[in-house]
Structures are given as C-alpha cells and as structure tokens.
C-alpha cells in the first residue's frame, strides 16, 4: 500500500505492521521515510557449483547450451570441495547484497565423487542463519545417458539433496528423456 506505516521488528522478524507504533524506551527507531520495505528476494534457478567459472577452462564462444555444458564437463574434473564452497560463497555474498535471501541451486551430480554436492551441503549448513539454500540434485550429463546416473541421483538424495531435477532434452534418445522424467 502507498500509506505510510510502521514495522515493529522483534528478534529479527516482523512482529507488527501498523500505523503509529510507539517505540518502547530503549528500542531502536530507524526512520525509513520515503523508502519501501520488501521481503527478501528469491533466486529460483542458479548453479552455484559452477558459479564464477566463466572462461575456465575456456570461453563458450558459440554461446550455446551444448557448448556451455561441454565447457563445464572440462571444468568439473578440477573441482575440489574448497573450490566449490569458495566460489558459491562469493556468489551468495553478491546475491545477499542485492536482497536475495532464498536460493535454489542445481548441483551437477553426474560426477562420481559428488564433490560439488558435498561442498554445497556443507555450505548450506554453514550459512543456514544467513540464507535459505535449497539444493536440487541435477544430472547435467543425463540420468540415463551418464554412466550410473540413476545411482548418482539416488546417492545425492541420500546425502541430503532437497529435490531432484532432470535434463530430458540432453538424454541420448526421446525414450531416455521420458524415462528420466519418470525416474525423477
């Protein structure tokens, strides 16, 4: 609404929204006249495991999804837990500075080590008081087209993934695409 109002915050949460709330003695008052209060924003689709890797190992010169996936396949062999956590933390800092408080990240689980999943699960726990992170087990190489893809998806869920995704258009056949959706 365009009407001026007050917001009483207690223990970091909105307790009351009403006009002319009187502050108790000793309570901090912040004059936000002329500003707007908004809830935290939501980043509904990001790949924090590959955040801040543009140009490493090479640039996606065609700009296509398929070349981007090929670049990522070359990059992910160099992953370490610390590398994933560092880059993801830096990306989250930038998101938080712009009002994002809830992040859904897709994590490539077509990696036999599941190192990115492990790193992001740790980071989710470390940042739990600062940002809400939802982790999607995402089979970048395909559930059926990638060796042991189904098993890797199941392992990611056992590790703590919040939900699963799929990439049916990347599977080798239409039938695999349909089956991958049924599996997910």
Question: Residue spans of the language-model regions?
Answer:
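Histidine-rich, glycine-flanked metal-binding segment
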Residues: 1-38
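Short coil/turn connectors at secondary-structure junctions
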Residues: 25-27, 33, 98-101, 128-133, ...
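Hydrophobic faces of well-ordered beta-strands that scaffold small-molecule active sites
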Residues: 40-44, 103-105, 131-138, 162-166
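Hydrophobic alpha-helical hairpins/lids featuring a short glycine-rich hinge
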Residues: 44, 69-114
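Active-site gating loops and adjacent loop-to-helix segments of metal-dependent hydrolytic enzymes
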Residues: 52-84, 160-163, 184
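Active-site mouth loops of central-metabolism enzymes
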Residues: 70-86, 136-147, 168-175
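Histidine/acidic residue-rich metal-binding segments in metalloenzymes
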Residues: 115-127, 145-184
